[in-house]
Structures are given as structure tokens and as C-alpha cells.
Amino acid sequence: MYNRLRSMSFSCSAMDSAGPNISLELLPLELREVYQSWRRSSATPDNYSDDVQECDWPVSIYVPERYEEGYAYPLLTWFHSDANDEDQLEDVMNAVSSQNYVGLALRGNTELGKPGGYRWDPATFAQGSVGLSELMHLTTCRLRRAFHVHSERIFVAGSGHGADAALHLFSRHPDWFAGAILLDPFCEPGTLPAEGPGGLDRKSVLVSLSRTCALDNLGRCVAAVRTLRTAGASVDVRMTELPVDPVSPEARSLDYWMMECIQREQEGGICR
């Protein structure tokens, strides 16, 4: 994999292939043609363009110190807050839960002059010619080949403009995720699809908003929550006195929320 990686106990070679390792001979006859057609399609991560396959977008992976091979871990995909980078992932994972999840983070696509670091630019969720959706799909597929990740327990989360990036991805590809966590999003224009999101029925979303946020920001967030609920999502809005610090002890509540989602999914319900 060409993405630059920083991680714990991780080998880049383990993520060279994105597709599932399936032996054609082991498939039922009626599924072989479907599988072969899928492998040849442009939607297959291994068939993405060279720009995507060889993108040098920096990525960080978090693996629990006591990683258990036989356990299917939930995956937390993190979009960092402003003036940070992908290395914020380790602090976030330690604050949320150091053991319960595998973590994945990409660097924001806009470098900041002062105070330094990066952020996500809502005007274009891309890195050069490489779109965020394609790169995230490819990276997640490769990650699942390297580690035992539960395909139905992938959460997307972010803070600030990172929350906008998370919402952008979640609203366009809800089938990829079990739920979304949006900490103090800006909900800039273009974050949600112009035609309105689809496929959100019974999807769980957690939104935190600070009482100190600007009125125009609050208005955009209220409108976004209404749009998500109209599309069928179950949105839990939590008001806080100050913006949530994703690396502080209060981030532990995100673990509780995700574990509740997983429990309700096992019971056939939704997270509230």
C-alpha cells in the first residue's frame, strides 16, 4: 500500500490487496458468475485507478495493544479536528477505549499556516485528483484484510471540520457504516448531498453541539439534523457547555454510545 502509515505493530505489506480472498472453486456455481463480474467491475477496490491505488495520502492505524486474532473488532474511522493531523488518532483511541476498537485516520486535505497542522476543507473532500470516498473505501478494505474487523460495526466520527468530512462520507455511503459521531460539526454547505441523503433508515447518529457555537453554525446544524431525521436516521443530539475535546476523559462516552449501538444491533433495534 502506498499510503504513508504510522501505526502500532503494523506491516504495510499486510494491506497490499483490497479484495476478499475467495477461492472461486469453493463458491456455489450460482455465485461464481456474480463474483467474477464483481471482480471485473470498476467498483472493486483493486480496480480503482492508479491515482487512487498509489495515493500518498498519510494514514494512521490504531491497533489495541492486546489485539486478539479471533475477535471481530469494531472499526472507528476518525477525521481529526482542525490544526491537527492523523496522529491525533492514538490520543482519541486512548480516550475513547484503548482496547475495544481498531482505529483508522487520514490527514486533512488542507495545510494550515498558523497555528500549524491540517484541517478538512469542506469545499472539496479530495486530495488532488483522488476523492475521499474512493480512498476511504480502498483503505478500509485493505485494513480488513490485515485485521479482523466486523463489517457491520464500522463507525465514522470526527470533530469540527472533521465532523463535516465524516457527515459527508456517511450521508453518501450509509451502507458502509453502523453509525456516525459528529462532535461540534460546522455543517458547511455541500456537506450533505444536494438531493438529500438516502438509505439512512434506522441508522444511528450522535451529534454534540456546544452552547457557545455561533448562531449561524447552530442554525446549519439544526437544519442538518432535521434532514437526517427526515431521511430516517435516529439522531441523538447532546448539548454541551463547551466543545467536546475528543482526547479528554469525556470522550469515553463515545465508547458507551457505540457499545449501545452494537448491543441494539444484536437485538435488532437502533441506538438512541
Labelled PLM ranges:
Residues 1-73, 101, 223-235, 256, ...:
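A domain-start/cap signature at the N-terminus of enzymes
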Residues 38, 51, 55-67, 74-148:
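Serine-hydrolase catalytic machinery in alpha/beta-hydrolase-like enzymes
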Residues 59, 103, 150, 154, ...:
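Hydrophobic anchor at the start of a short beta-strand
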Residues 73-74, 99-102, 151-153, 175-179, ...:
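Loop/turn elements at helix/coil->beta-strand transitions in domains of secreted/extracellular proteins
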Residues 87-89, 115, 166, 191-192, ...:
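Short glycine-/acidic-enriched loop or helix-start segments at secondary-structure transitions
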Residues 152-200:
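Primarily recognizes the serine-hydrolase "nucleophile elbow" in alpha/beta-hydrolase
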Residues 179, 184-263:
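The feature captures the conserved acid-bearing segment of alpha/beta-hydrolase catalytic domains
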